[in-house]
Amino acid sequence: LETEYDASTFDTDPFEPQPQGCRTIFPFFVANQNRGGAPGYVELPYTLPQDSTLYLLLGERTPDIWLRKLDWIVQRGGLALVNIHPDYMDFERSDYAAFRYPASHVEDLLDYVSTRYRDEFWNPLPKELAAWFRASCLPARPHPPGGAAKLP
């Protein structure tokens, strides 16, 4: 793939076909195993349970699982990334309907992050996080002949 990043892997998710996930709360580099093309991409794992699993499948009534997992991730210096489906949110009522959950749960998560972790987090776009990871976390490579640097 000619892509800079991917965000389709979960750290763990017992409700997915591969429940073990990638087993990390940190971004990582996936090298291209083929010759030619892009050198690889940065994987940004989802580390918070997706909304549809929590509220529609498990029937959770509060964002407490998100908040507890977020605190656990912060203690370890990891990436907090959640998959949210606006089409499952109920923006008009505060109760649960078939295949809908209150949008206030997402608001509560965002309020919690901005209050509890004020000035302690970075909220980049995925492409910005992937670029930072490539520049800051991958080992430096010697420049190829001609002086042009290539990504690892």
Residue ranges and their predicted role:
Residues 63-152:
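C-terminal domain-boundary segment and adjacent tail
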